[in-house]
Each structure stands twice: as C-alpha cells, then as structure tokens.
C-alpha cells in the first residue's frame, strides 16, 4: 500500500506510525478534515475497527487505526480501553499517570505487573467485510514515579526490567522495535499481500 489514512489525532501515535510504516505515505485524518470516531466498542479491537471504518468511509481510501492502552491486571484491567481518558475526558498524560499511581500506591512490585496492548485494524475500503486485524503486547511494570521524556502516554511509568529503564527513557529506535505497536504492525505486514 503506497498511501494510507491514519485514523487518529494523537500526535504521539501519528509520529510512531509514520516511523513504523515508512516508506508508506501516511495521511493523518485531520489533514482531510476528518474528526475522531466515537469509541463505543468494549474492546481494543472493536474500537480499532470503528475508527478505521470511520476514516475510510469519509476519505474513500484505505485507513489504519490503532487502539491501544495500558492493562494492569491487579486493577482488573484498568485503565484498559479508557487509558487516554483514565482521569477524565479532558485529562492529559500527566493527569492519567497521577490517577494510575494514586490507585497503585499501596501495591507490591508483583502487583505492579502491566502490559500495553495494541489492536490495529486496516480497512482496505469502507465496507471491507474482512478488515485486517493485528495485535501486539508489550510487558513491563508500573514504576512508583515517572522518569524519562521520550514517547507519550504512560511511557514514563512503564518500567522495562530487561532495559533497566522506563519506555520514556528508551531511544525511539529501540522502542519502535519492541513495543506493542511495533509487534502489531509486524504482524499486519505478514498479513498484507506482496
């Protein structure tokens, strides 16, 4: 695919997707005047399909959507599909991180296990009855305080034992090789015809 609509307005996701999808030409939906789809699904996969179908129908082109978030099993899967608005509709990344750290304040290291989950949906056209779906998982733990300035979202509190740092302290080159989004996109590439 030479050109694809990115069904997101999240600048962090756009930057990562553009890097990971190169040399494909990526057009953020906002560049075409397309607003975000309402995320009414109950799972990451449902929301990715809703967003990709919305962008594809309005652009009349193939569209790719990523719905991803942080899952903390000891919090019954929170923040989950509500990761971007965990501390409220108008919350920013720092607000969401503080909400998470507050809820986890008394948890042991073992209870701080977490993972990022990414679902990617590719609609080849708006009425695509068989969208391509790929998923990726990125395991780590939630640190007790934020550290690092790279990345976005919960990266400053997502600690990676293997690298002895948070995802926000990793160089983009490494993160773009090991993250949930990178794993999902690699899976998607394997589904695409040559």
UniProtKB/Swiss-Prot annotation:
Keyword set, alphabetical order: Hydrolase, Magnesium, Metal-binding, Nucleotide metabolism, Nucleotide-binding
Enzymatic reactions: XTP + H2O = XMP + diphosphate + H(+); dITP + H2O = dIMP + diphosphate + H(+); ITP + H2O = IMP + diphosphate + H(+)
InterPro entries: dITP/XTP_pyrophosphatase, ITPase-like_fam, RdgB/HAM1
One Gene Ontology molecular-function label: dITP diphosphatase activity
GO terms under biological process: nucleotide metabolic process; purine nucleoside triphosphate catabolic process
UniProt cofactor(s): Mg(2+)
Binding sites annotated in the UniProt record for substrate: 8-13, 68, 152-155, 175, 180-181
Catalytic site positions: 67
Residues at which Mg(2+) binds: 38, 67
EC number: 3.6.1.66
UniProt record similarity statement: Belongs to the HAM1 NTPase family.
Subunit composition and interactions: Homodimer.
The name this protein goes by in its record: dITP/XTP pyrophosphatase
Source organism: Legionella pneumophila subsp. pneumophila (strain Philadelphia 1 / ATCC 33152 / DSM 7513)
């Amino acid at each position: 695919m030479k050109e694809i609509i990115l069904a997101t307005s999240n600048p962090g996701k756009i930057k990562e997707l553009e890097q990971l999808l190169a040399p494909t030409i990526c057009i953020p939906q906002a560049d075409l005047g397309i607003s975000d789809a309402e995320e009414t699904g109950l799972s990451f996969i449902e929301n990715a399909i809703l967003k990709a179908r919305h962008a594809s129908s309005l652009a009349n082109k193939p569209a790719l959507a990523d719905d991803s978030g942080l899952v903390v099993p000891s919090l019954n899967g929170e923040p989950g599909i509500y990761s971007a608005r965990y501390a409220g509709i108008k919350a920013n990344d720092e607000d969401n991180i503080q909400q998470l750290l507050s809820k986890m304040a008394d948890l042991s290291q073992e209870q701080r296990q977490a993972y990022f989950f990414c679902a990617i949906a590719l609609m080849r056209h708006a009425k695509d009855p068989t969208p391509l779906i790929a998923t990726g998982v990125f395991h780590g733990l939630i640190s007790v305080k934020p550290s690092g300035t790279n990345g976005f979202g919960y990266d400053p509190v997502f600690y990676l034992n293997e690298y002895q740092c948070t995802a926000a302290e990793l160089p983009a080159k490494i993160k773009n090789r090991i993250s949930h989004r990178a794993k999902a996109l690699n899976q998607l590439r394997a589904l695409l015809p040559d």
